[in-house]
Every structure is written in C-alpha cells, then in structure tokens.
C-alpha cells in the first residue's frame, strides 16, 4: 500500500517530480532505474507510476506510459502496473491533497483510455474529470478487450495520417 503522510505540502520545483520523491521517501521505496516503467516499485514485479492531477487546472488528460512499455511489462503475468493518482490544489507554493487512489491499470474503465500519437503510441486518460474505475479485469481479458482495440484504433489513425503524407510526398516526385 502507498500513502501520503500529510494533507499539505510545501514544494519546490515541479509538482509531479516533487511527489515522485515524496512517495518514495514516505513509503520507504527505492527509486527505479532511468528507463523503468514506474516511479517506484512495491516489489520487483509491481511498478507504480505516480500521477498528479491539479483539480483547478484546465487540462486533465494525462499520459500514463508508452503503450509498448506497458505491453512488454504486462505480457509477463507475474508483473503488475499500478498508478498512484494524487488529486491536489495548489496555492502559493503549498499543495493541498484532495484525494489519493492506488489503482491497477486493469481497474481503469476502458472508455477512459486512449492511445495517442507520441512515439509508438502513449496510453492516456482521456479526461481525469470523467475517469471511472471498475473491478480489476483479468489480464488476458484486458489485453483482448481493452489494449488490442485501443491499439487497433491508434494504428488505423496513424495509417490515415501516413497515407495523407504519402500523397504530399508523391506530389513532389518526378
């Protein structure tokens, strides 16, 4: 279990970076390597990524992680990926914690996820304000019913963009 010890924090620098450090320190967790999927590990098989949400902010669509990293990590059924969501309000260098939630990726409602065009695709929350959680899905079901359809939709969009780009390229040939 991951928790925050206080309701208010004075911070310096970026709030997401600050809370990644706070979560590690307050829960006696070791930082992972630079290329790791999560910001912390509960054990060698449970990656936890810290996600901060400013409830007074205008933009609430958060990147979760590269879809490729997620797939590679979760293909090993012994591995788990969790997100520690921290909802907060900020005022003059002080952050007030509204709520925290520790959830497996398989607990995020499928309608709340998308894969967007960054690199090989990044899995995102469509809108934190409308995110819903469900009972944890079986891993095989999650891959079949959530991941595969999202990836298919992403690939289709990318193919359409590339086809338009190909037409531009073809107009300059010859």
PLM regions with names:
Residues 1-174:
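Nucleic-acid endonuclease domains
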């Amino acid at each position: 279990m991951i928790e925050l010890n206080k309701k208010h924090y004075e911070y310096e620098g970026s709030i997401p970076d600050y809370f990644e450090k706070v979560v590690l320190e307050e829960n006696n967790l070791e930082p992972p390597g630079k290329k790791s999927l999560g910001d912390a590990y509960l054990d060698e098989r449970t990656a936890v990524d810290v996600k901060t949400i400013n409830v007074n902010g205008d933009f609430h669509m958060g990147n979760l992680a590269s879809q490729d990293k997620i797939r590679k990590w979760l293909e090993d059924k012994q591995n788990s990926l969790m997100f520690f969501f921290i909802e907060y309000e900020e005022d003059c260098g002080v952050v007030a914690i509204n709520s925290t939630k520790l959830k497996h990726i398989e607990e995020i409602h499928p309608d709340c996820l998308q894969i967007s065009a960054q690199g090989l695709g990044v899995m995102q929350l469509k809108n934190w304000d409308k995110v819903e959680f469900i009972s944890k899905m079986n891993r095989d079901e999650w891959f079949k019913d959530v991941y595969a359809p999202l990836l298919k939709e992403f690939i289709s969009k990318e193919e359409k963009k590339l086809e338009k780009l190909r037409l531009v390229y073809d107009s300059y040939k010859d």
